[in-house]
Amino acid sequence: MSGETFEFNIRHSGKVYPITLSTDATSADLKSKAEELTQVPSARQKYMVKGGLSGEESIKIYPLIKPGSTVMLLGTPDANLISKPAKKNNFIEDLAPEQQVQQFAQLPVGFKNMGNTCYLNATLQALYRVNDLRDMILNYNPSQGVSNSGAQDEEIHKQIVIEMKRCFENLQNKSFKSVLPIVLLNTLRKCYPQFAERDSQGGFYKQQDAEELFTQLFHSMSIVFGDKFSEDFRIQFKTTIKDTANDNDITVKENESDSKLQCHISGTTNFMRNGLLEGLNEKIEKRSDLTGANSIYSVEKKISRLPKFLTVQYVRFFWKRSTNKKSKILRKVVFPFQLDVADMLTPEYAAEKVKVRDELRKVEKEKNEKEREIKRRKFDPSSSENVMTPREQYETQVALNESEKDQWLEEYKKHFPPNLEKGENPSCVYNLIGVITHQGANSESGHYQAFIRDELDENKWYKFNDDKVSVVEKEKIESLAGGGESDSALILMYKGFGL
């Protein structure tokens, strides 16, 4: 390929510059060309390229740089150099890391509160974080029709998805400082009248239950998208119903399904796992078909299919007759950032998933070691060549995260079972990606918020308080377990490990 040319891009300070060079070009040629385009002196240029370009000037850049690729360039342009002040001032560099992120990163966009609509805003943010669902809605073409569900009033469900698409487009494009989902809200109230309930005295719209909205939106999307949507969330159970007083009275149901797991909260529930197991193993009283008398039955559910995305609902609200409202269980119930549900599966299914889990854990260990190694590699601050502004540090981290994300996903994928169903989790492990919280004493008052994990940085989370969006530390998420009327986890969104 000697003597031929190839094209690629360099990205610097948010701008992309196309470059054409000979396949024989050296790093010195690249730096000279980049200096013309960006005004970053050659000596200050740093390239995010595997193998590096900061050594000998005679290093050939092809095939270190692939044709059509985009390479991140770091370095301060000559015109923007500012000498260090003699005395300390309050510059960006003096801010805490999370404050620097908020200065340089384009924060996600929030939703305007239209009067007791925080339940809608928090739910939409959580759904938007589910990338497969987000893409499905953004790519929705109304002319493609709806599923063959046979549901009545399919057109109104189609309209809900269309309005969700408009909202998601605004979140994605960041066209406005905040999004006003008024048309979606009106469509929801038309389809589901409970969300149009007004206060009998003030006449204003009442606060609603975010979990109820979550369920109804799932219903609408199931009607519009059918299995294409449902498979990513469908949990399948093998249910055994047994009369505790008669060993011969046993019923087994193989294919029961749901779109979420419930975490039951009793006076002894301290951890989410206990609440989930309690929800899968219950006692009920019913009439026996064999004896004709009422009897106590044990209902044991074992999971026989795990979805790509797992939704967990904390059953915090219960109907209180004395107040005629859904009151809230304030108990603290700790949830994990990584959830392993191996002990909730049928024995055969567990054996398959545990085998894959162990292989994925090896990849995760290697990934964590590489990340620790990268963090240890710091640029020498005493060298003018290696001076990095906070903006460059931020861009460096983003570039590293983006470049490595696909690589590790491919590594995980190598260990997926060949018979994996569409929308199925390859293992029995999930990572937390979002939490919808409630603040207050009952579902008809208080405030809902969403806490969403960054798609590239697992340690960075965003707090969505309607249209006010901020970055929070991972430690803040741990405090959402409850224990009072402050933010308490209500709905948790998990994504399959390695996906």
Curated annotation (Swiss-Prot):
SMART domains membership: UBQ
Entry-linked InterPro entries: Papain-like_cys_pep_sf, Peptidase_C19_UCH, Ubiquitin-like_dom, Ubiquitin-like_domsf, UBP14-like, USP_CS, USP_dom
EC number from the UniProt entry: 3.4.19.12
Entry GO terms, CC: proteasome complex; proteasome regulatory particle
pH dependence: Optimum pH is 8.5-9.
Annotated keywords: Hydrolase, Phosphoprotein, Protease, Thiol protease, Ubl conjugation pathway
Coiled coil spans: none
Entry note about domains: The N-terminal ubiquitin-like domain is required for proteasome association and UBP6 activation at the proteasome.
Family, as annotated: Belongs to the peptidase C19 family. USP14/UBP6 subfamily.
Protein name stated in the entry: Ubiquitin carboxyl-terminal hydrolase 6
Gene that this sequence comes from: UBP6
